[in-house]
UniProtKB/Swiss-Prot annotation:
Recorded family membership: Belongs to the peptidase M17 family.
Record's protein name: Putative aminopeptidase C13A11.05
GO MF assignments: aminopeptidase activity; manganese ion binding; metalloaminopeptidase activity; peptidase activity
Species name: Schizosaccharomyces pombe (strain 972 / ATCC 24843)
SUPFAM superfamilies per UniProt: Macro domain-like (SSF52949), Zn-dependent exopeptidases (SSF53187)
Cofactors that this protein relies on: Zn(2+)
Binding-site positions, Zn(2+) 2: K280, D285, D303, E364
Binding site for Zn(2+) 1: D285, D362, E364
Enzyme class: hydrolase
Amino acid sequence: MKGLGLSTRTFNWSSLSSILLPRIPLATTKADSLILAVRHDKQVFSEDYRQVVDQYFETSPKKNDIRLFWNTQGFVRLAIVQLEENVSEKSVRSAAAEAAKILKSNGAKSIAVDGMGFPKDAALGAALATYDFSLRRDHLSVYQDEKVVEKENLFTSPAPERLTFQLLSNTSEKKTATAEENAFKVGLIEAAAQNLARSLMECPANYMTSLQFCHFAQELFQNSSKVKVFVHDEKWIDEQKMNGLLTVNAGSDIPPRFLEVQYIGKEKSKDDGWLGLVGKGVTFDSGGISIKPSQNMKEMRADMGGAAVMLSSIYALEQLSIPVNAVFVTPLTENLPSGSAAKPGDVIFMRNGLSVEIDNTDAEGRLILADAVHYVSSQYKTKAVIEASTLTGAMLVALGNVFTGAFVQGEELWKNLETASHDAGDLFWRMPFHEAYLKQLTSSSNADLCNVSRAGGGCCTAAAFIKCFLAQKDLSFAHLDIAGVMDKQLNSWDCDGMSGRPVRTIIEVARKY
């Protein structure tokens, strides 16, 4: 039996989980600050603020200009932002984001947000743009109820949200006001889910191991009647013949885990199927024996980004009570070099019986995902399986940091993904699933498949490899390579660090099932 690893001997997990556990940042008391939007033609969503709006236009603002007013209209800080001529979901997200960042930098603790006609997007922009994560001592002090943090324990008290939001209602009509409040709260929940994915990806790898990721999942849903969490150990993994996961884990002192999370959002019937969600869970990827360059290797703490995205999506489904039955699985391990690590040239037999030659140990994600995809597509009656992974550097080369690369089998699933990504304000680009890429992986004389190809198109051959392990070959399936969008900032509501994309697209897809 493997050891538990240095981190579990020196670190009190429950301390950090108090910071990681999401909280819906909905303010319950009057806000100290306000975001107020005006149109280019000087129209304002609420005439109650006409006087300060007139002062704003006296400064001859340009489009998207933000002015900060102090101690006016009952608020300590009031930020006025001018919207674009054509108001849209995206422009509202952007306006709320920019204004919220200014208010936060000027000491705001609670912000009332003008709904601007799109209250959900106003909430998203404000809550996403003001996210941050740090384990610096001076940063951690803001989490505490007391002003002084004890030397012995940086996490002496539960971490409250440092910034909360409430909707500035612009209507006296009760039904409309309720609908706007509900939409605003949905935006905050979706933002909290994406921010959760960000935090899990940001968490240092000595804290976010396979064991601790599972511990966190159990904590996250411990009070939920709709979610069941199953943590499978090394013995179970061996019984399941998940040799891809066991082989990648061979170089690590921390044992692997296979996490299975069921969300029951509606009553089951004979005709209903599961929405299968699979996420890559490599908690740190050094490349193994085929070791990566040391520059920027620390970013590989986020190689479990697929697992973080899918777990956070399940959290959102549960919070929003979306009527769908979804199952999320992730194989969790580190990929490290050691005397017992897998070597180039090794041959293993996968869960579905196919033999695979390991030509490059840094192409480990597809090995563990192959077993996971086969498990979920064989053990569950799935109507579709969506897998997300920070899989290939080739994806960054192909699409940069703008689009998630989507390899999709099934036109209906692609249509749903494309529509969902548009609704979420995310960007997807369809990539080719073609048998020609698979042929490039069958050149080994020792095994059915090789885990890499020498012919280029690395993101395409990786997708073709994973597809081989579907239990039903015609099953609707999407492989989302999120390596390019893992930590790149694209919009004004993004911030430094990991992106948490594409959590909100997964939520939108689930709504359509």
